[in-house]
Amino acid sequence: MKAIVCLCHGYGDTCTFFLDGIARNIAAAGYGVFALDYPGFGLSEGLHGYIPSFDTLVDDVAETFAKVKGNPDYRGIPSFLFGQSMGGAVALKIHFKQPDEWNGAILVAPMCKISDDVVPAWPVQQVLIFLAKLLPKEKLVPQKDLAELAFKEEEKREQTSYNVIAYKDKPRLRTALEMLRTTQEIESRLEEVSLPIIILHGDADLVTDPAVSKDLYEKAKTSDKTLRLYKDAYHSILEGEPDEAIFQVLDDITSWLDQHSAKEV
């Protein structure tokens, strides 16, 4: 085993559907891959799609990954975070909590800022903030069709309907506010990113803002940083693009892992 890769899934995914295929590809390249469904997502316990505290969610994920890394069989093996979309925010928050405990991070269309095309207008946000105090679990946040925005290939977009355990309803009020608060925090802390990173983002992404991925690349204090922007690619660069484009992204990821795992041996 070359290294451990700990996967953090996105808001509209779980670790048992699209992410499973990504994990198998990375594992086939010689890596031990580990993932979990967040509380309230996938097969985990909790109210479906409800994030009462993003910080608590991050703590739960970090605790699980710490148990993996603490296994005596994996002692001395490099470990990497992999975060896709909202999972990119989870990975960055874990890094902020544990700045010296990971050998690098792979950030795929990371949720450093939710695109203005998806976020409700400012007056609507103020109403939702007020309502969230009274009705935090209610599904009242207006939302565009994320599959339409995220998947370029229609045939692959249609596959999202088979991910029956993924959350597909309107966001719950508290969940939406926690995600917005988290992105605001991350956007203000880009300079603190100190571990080796590769950022991969479609330049036509209308879900998470590729401009902030550029900011992350420019502002992160690590000198070991790579940015890959894919021309005309949408949000789901590992699931919703033409096959040859997906293979290119996967190759970029495994090549980066190979280079950085070799450095740690």
Where do the protein language model's features map onto the residues?
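Alpha/beta-hydrolase fold nucleophile elbow
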Residues: 72-85
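Alpha/beta-hydrolase active-site loop
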Residues: 51-70
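Active-site glycine-rich loops that stabilize anionic/oxyanionic intermediates
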Residues: 2, 9-13, 203
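Alpha/beta-hydrolase-fold enzymes
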Residues: 84-171
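Short alpha-helix in the alpha/beta-hydrolase fold that links the catalytic acid
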Residues: 195, 209-218
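The serine-hydrolase catalytic nucleophile loop
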Residues: 11-23
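Catalytic active-site module of serine/aspartate enzymes centered on a nucleophile-bearing elbow/loop
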Residues: 231-265
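Short beta-strand/loop motif that positions the catalytic acidic residue
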Residues: 193, 199-201, 205
